[in-house]
Amino acid sequence: VPVAKLAVFRDPIAARADRNMAIGYTGQAYLWLDNKASAGGNPWLNPYSDEAVRFIGDLIGEVQSMGFDHVLLENVQFPSAQNGKQDFGSTGGRGRSAQLAADIAAWDARFEGSVTLWYGYSLGQVTDGASTVGGSATALGVRNLVVEVPAKQTMDDTARNELRNTLSASG
């Protein structure tokens, strides 16, 4: 089955094209970058932006119109760099995990019955919890989870059981 893969919030092209969908610097009119500009830093789409969530939904619809019935969404997360200079605009009082869960629920509802959405996360984001997702990716309400295990990392029986238990506990 052909699967389309989309980078979601880590989309520097869309962030530059429509600054209203991007993370900004607090108190400035500049786009926030995940590294120094001289080191190739890139802007990200803002998970709190309704416009960004709609835009991503429109991208899913576009790949669906190309004939893809399965879409893998990666980078459904916040940037790992947290320096207090990021301006997410109005958060509505939602934490990171709650916001990502709401974004995921919106896409799942929009494409229910027409596209199977898969969400890709690293092993660490699933088992250890991460600031990029506001906890464990298993708490986001994801129905179809793809777990990326680093090629150099072998999983012993204990690690395999921990992953199995984490995934089982999340439903």
Give the role of each language-model region.
Residues 3-11, 71-75, 94-132, 171:
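Aromatic-lined carbohydrate-recognition surfaces of secreted/lumenal glycan-active proteins
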Residues 44-85:
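Active-site groove signature of glycoside hydrolases
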Residues 10-61:
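Active-site-adjacent "subsite" loops/lids of carbohydrate-active enzymes
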Residues 84-98:
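Glycine-rich tight-turn/loop motif centered on a GG-T
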Residues 157-171:
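C-terminal soluble interaction/assembly domains
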Residues 117-122, 126-159:
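Aromatic- and acid-rich polysaccharide-binding/catalytic face
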Residues 56, 63, 136-139, 166:
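Generic structural signal for hydrophobic
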Residues 52, 56, 100-104, 160:
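Aromatic/hydrophobic pocket-lining residues that form the small-molecule binding cavity
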